[in-house]
Amino acid sequence: MELFPAQPDLSLQISPPNSKPSSTWQRRRSTTDQEDHEELDLGFWRRALDSRTSSLVSNSTSKTINHPFQDLSLSNISHHQQQQQHHHPQLLPNCNSSNILTSFQFPTQQQQQHLQGFLAHDLNTHLRPIRGIPLYHNPPPHHHPHRPPPPCFPFDPSSLIPSSSTSSPALTGNNNSFNTSSVSNPNYHNHHHQTLNRARFMPRFPAKRSMRAPRMRWTTTLHARFVHAVELLGGHERATPKSVLELMDVKDLTLAHVKSHLQMYRTVKTTDKAAASSGQSDVYENGSSGDNNSDDWMFDMNRKSRDSEELTNPLEKSNGLWTNSSGEARLHGKLIDNVAEIMLPSEKELDGKCSSYERISSEEMSSSSISGTSPFKPNLEFTLGRSH
């Protein structure tokens, strides 16, 4: 018999030693060589099985460390079983709480193998690549006979209890209750599905609200419409951009366009008004005080003196006998006296009664009377030959 047979002897059963030796052991201990060989073979298989059971126990202890809620659920298994017995007495015909507790505290080799297969299947399903839209809250149902659907709460202690074929009917009923509670709320999954679709199709960056207004050319007709609207509102000082925009009623015109144009229009109007007021200040500055009228009097005096010189020059040319200095002095003296006699009463009357405009009109009338009467008097005197 070889040391490592190709096919192990499955007829061997490992069990604690019995007080009564069996007949099989007596037959195999017939010879000493056969006894030594059997002891060596049994020692090899015992070591192999011990290593396998130790690995399974280490896996189970690591799972209990990673999932601390399992101990709590196992310790409270009698409470769950009592509730199931109270509500569903037909589910537990032949089960006691002590049997369920011992079956979970000391799992058999078949349960451990099934648990390993379940964990491997769970890891393979979770490590699959996700294609399309990932719906984390609504995974597709896996029709596995021993795997319950994942509950809504990820840290539920009852979800950590493995449901095997040899588990108690109480736990299967508990898992079915969780399944119905998770399926009975379809609005929750629909809501998450809609939010994920909305987040997918929404743009990443929202559109800017404060976009700059496009440039616009102010034509003559548009400006005329603007000026008309400003005049209807009572001038550029009272008009507001919003009211002007409403009165103009132009399609592509914005409030920014009207605001900037109204500001420019106000600056132009104020500068024009300042220039006009500075140009007219020389004429209308002292109109009420009479200084402007005095300038007009000086201008009229110069004009009258020029007229008198024109009158005397043709007389001197026509009459050579009267070209002496005494005649010129008398002629100039008479003209000045006549002008003074006319001017003095007119000034007194105008200062007491008339305004500046009436003074100007009276001055024109007095100048016309002087120019009309003065040439006849010297002509009459010279024609008559009167000498003083």
From Swiss-Prot:
It is found in: Nucleus. GO terms for biological process: abaxial cell fate specification; carpel development; plant ovule development; polarity specification of adaxial/abaxial axis; regulation of DNA-templated transcription. One of its GO terms (cellular component) is nucleus. It comes from the Eukaryota. The keyword Protein biosynthesis does not apply. Expressed in developing phloem. It comes from Arabidopsis thaliana (Mouse-ear cress). It holds the Pfam family Myb_DNA-binding. The gene is KAN2. This is Probable transcription factor KAN2. SUPFAM superfamilies: Homeodomain-like. Residues 1-38, 271-326, 359-388 are annotated as: Disordered. The keyword Amino-acid biosynthesis does not apply. Signal peptide: none annotated. GO terms for molecular function: DNA-binding transcription factor activity; transcription cis-regulatory region binding.
